[in-house]
């Protein structure tokens, strides 16, 4: 039986003044043809709370101006929609990578307006195989590395910010993290929800998370207690 944290999120009562409220409103009103059954899970209270926490901490730590933001394990593009719709942020584009080929269609649907403006793309890729020195989205929805098999001379530079909120789903961490260039700005989340079968790389606490993701400079570290688990977040430079 699901508790409230695992039910679909809704807008808070009252008009509200939070800068991310319009983004959440647009996201919850978005319609995707033949939506997958687990889309509601991607929009539940836990998911939205953890992503809102990320945006608040990101803005407070690094400000709101970014060029290219790469989302690893981006799933259905919920974080991308919230980021691009948040008035505090000026982001050129978001590239959302997920190994599941079924995610891209849904992510593009939730980010339809941003896709039309060239500010969002969902790409099917194994993040352990990405060339993080230069990421480029191809028109057919497959990931390409600008320093690898991307179009020569297209001027694409590496991501200004790399975000992975799915660290608990990816093991070992080194498989994807070793490819991120030193000095890269990054935001990562994990949790201690060991009882979830899909979580193959949980951490016991914030210190364990820091040990698993060694950063040259930690700019923010924090935890958020939820009913079934605690969420951990790190912001910094590799």
Regions found by a protein language model. Give the residues of each.
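S-adenosyl-L-methionine
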Residues: 2-65, 105-156
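Conserved class I S-adenosyl-L-methionine
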Residues: 65-76
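Conserved SAM-binding loop of SAM-dependent methyltransferases across substrates and taxa
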Residues: 76-90
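Short beta-strand element of Class I
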Residues: 91-97
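Conserved SAM/SAH-binding beta-strand->alpha-helix loop
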Residues: 99-102
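A short SAM/SAH-binding and catalytic strip from SAM-dependent methyltransferases
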Residues: 158-173
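C-terminal substrate-binding/active-site "lid" region of AdoMet-derived donor-dependent transferases
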Residues: 172-234
């Amino acid at each position: 039986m699901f508790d409230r944290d695992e039910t679909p999120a809704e807008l808070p009562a009252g008009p509200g003044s939070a800068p991310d409220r319009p983004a959440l409103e647009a996201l919850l009103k978005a319609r995707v043809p033949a939506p997958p059954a687990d889309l509601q899970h991607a929009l539940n209270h836990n998911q939205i709370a953890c992503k809102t926490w990320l945006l608040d901490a990101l803005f407070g730590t690094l400000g709101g101006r970014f060029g290219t933001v790469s989302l690893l394990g981006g799933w259905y593009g919920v974080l991308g929609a919230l980021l691009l719709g948040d008035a505090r942020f000026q982001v050129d584009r978001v590239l959302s990578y997920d190994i599941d080929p079924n995610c891209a269609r849904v992510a593009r649907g939730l980010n339809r307006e941003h896709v039309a403006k060239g500010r969002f793309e969902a790409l099917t890729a194994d993040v352990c195989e990405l060339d993080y020195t230069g990421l480029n989205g191809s028109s057919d929805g497959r990931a390409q590395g600008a320093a690898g098999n991307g179009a020569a001379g297209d001027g694409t530079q590496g991501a200004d910010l790399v975000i992975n909120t799915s660290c608990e789903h990816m093991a070992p961490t080194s498989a994807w993290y070793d490819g991120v260039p030193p000095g890269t700005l990054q935001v990562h989340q994990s949790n201690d929800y060991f009882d979830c079968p899909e979580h193959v790389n949980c951490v016991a606490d914030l210190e364990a998370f820091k040990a698993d993701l060694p950063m040259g400079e930690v700019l923010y570290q924090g935890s958020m207690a939820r009913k079934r688990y605690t969420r951990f977040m790190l912001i910094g430079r590799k």
